[in-house]
Amino acid sequence: CILIYKNDMLMIKKEHLVSDISKLKKVYNQSFPWLVTLAEESENAKYFKDALRSLILSWLTEKESTQENVGMAVARRILLLIEHDDTFVDELSTGERLPVRTVTYLWQFLTGHLENEVSPDLFIDLYHQFDLLEHPVEILPDRALVKRQMSRWPTGLDPEVIAIRERNKERIIACLIKKIERRHSPSSRFQFAEGISYEEKEARVREWWNTARFHLSMAIKSPTELNFFLGYSLSDETMSLLARAKKKGMPFFVTPYYLSLLNIEHEGYDDATVRSYIMYSNELVDTYGSIKAWEKEDMVVADEPNAAGWLLPEGHNIHRRYPEVAILIPDSMGRACGGLCASCQRMYDFQSERLNFDFEALKPKESWDRKLRRLMRYFEEDAQLRDILITGGDALMSQNATLRKILEAVYKMAVRKRKANESRPEGEKYAELQRVRLGSRLLAYLPLRVTDELVGILREFKEKASAIGVSQFYIQTHFQSPLEVTPEARHAIEAILAAGWTITNQLVYTVSASRRGHTAKLRQTLNALGVVCYYTFSVKGFRENYAVYTPNSRSLQEAREEKIFGQVPEEKQAELYDMIRNQRPLGKCLVRFLKENGLLFAGTDRNVLNLPAIGKSMTFHTIGLTSEGKRILKFDHDGSRRHSPIIDQMGEVYIVENKSVAAYLRQLKEIGEDVNEYRTIWNYCEGETEPRFSIYEYPAYPFKATDRMTNLEL
């Protein structure tokens, strides 16, 4: 399928991909006869590059007087491709040394001398760059269009969606009754008394349904059970794939609650974004067992610095990339999750079984209390750490007693660190704890976990910690779709906000989530409940995530054409900051603020890629394309935040995207999208990291802290 845009008209030629080269050559002949002639008159690729460079430079000189910014940007883009052609780059995520031959391939293609198998996707991308050079198009975001695109996506609070899910719940309850009847687990609290009627069993399951422990106990753990609970609606192809996954040892874990969010009816809502989170792809199953850690700093070796230069305690409890923040993964049920996300960034840890769903084995041992005290000393004795992110797995998977102990240990550590600073002079004082975060997807996966007792623990900790200088308390959650925002999720969100914590959302920008208007609708839906958005993450690019991978160009397109209608005016940001920190009920306050300022939502999130060992950034240039048409991006780190000094020792950072733009558009077409709505995607070949919203900045200290870094070895 060749995807060519010409004068805003989409021409789709239905041919097999491998046979499209000749047809694509005819398109070049018709559209760019000058380029074909230039190639044919060049003896080799070097002469072609020299001639093309001279032509582009001459064109640039002519255009400088006209201030034609779009065309000039494209011209510089093509010059970058020429500059990097016939070079090698070290790809950061894989460590491979890769040749860059973009313009050489173009010359071979135009002269009929392709030496290697090269995908048409490469030449489709280049076609659009030359088309933009000749016909630059100024992108004008359309608010009315974005509103229409947002209206496509229902939420879990819509009456029609709730009605379908009530029917799902009835079906699943019937399945649960059969499951409990077949179980032989005398120790389980979820069993039926002898001789009770079906109606009594049904009433008991309805009662249990409202407790998180029931859903975890009854989680679906096999493909056949999954199909049973989904009314035998899975295809033979899907069942075969899931059977292969099980044979390879991939864990399955889906709660009845989350399963009730799927739609197995022929009518009703599109559940692809939710479904793709629990259904595995061929690529994921193929690579499971050989998946590598994308987060290179997560690979910890005793007495050796990690990839970011930080020395860490032995084991896998503390992960660190930046000077100010470290992640704590407790030895508890927090190493499990409420479900296994198919695009999980820690799939490597599930593969190694450091993260798993064996709840009994994950319960804290007596030695954990001692270990926790030792881990807290790391935070206490570090000169720069002022932010702790407790995650996993999932922080809220820890039992209440365990979570209370962890938070108490954090509190005592913060007290000691503050006390120690009293004897340190100005300029030598250590960073004190200012921010505590709990990373959890349970607000989407299993909001029933948010009980009165849990809320009480959060409220009590905030009150105590606020008195010793901790001022930021965040639940860092992960809603992927507005369909996950259910009445149960709303109740959980309201309870946590009432306890004084802020809830921030991180989205993974999968293919289904990247559809026009989808992310904008999610922001709007969350804002209405008082949740503020934090990051929109590009999917990390190893092969296991090929099926869900969205190119960074689409993320940039979303930010500049959709998220722009949630851009908070600079003069209003202080008001929004105060509202998020202090005003309740936050949802109603946010809705009023958005309406008063003509915003569709609050676009407080940053669209970024998490780079191995370096951190979050969207500052890059496209310097080439692989033979498969995948873009080769040259990244720079986010200059707006502090990094490990190792950043100064690292060379240039190159990342190869997981999928070509053309392949992504074909995938969108296969799931029913009108790809004409995405036609400006080819314009986005370079990015710049967005500024951070003020609520995500650390507050200033009332003293001068040291610049010295401890626990660092370069």
Name every feature range the model reports, one short phrase each.
Residues 336, 347-388, 401, 405-408, ...:
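Conserved alpha-helical substructure of the radical SAM core
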Residues 254, 559-714:
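C-terminal accessory regions of radical SAM enzymes
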Residues 15-40, 56-60, 64, 91, ...:
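Radical SAM enzyme [4Fe-4S]-AdoMet core and its adjacent flexible, acidic
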Residues 4-321:
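Flexible, acidic/Gly-rich N-terminal and inter-domain linker regions that tether
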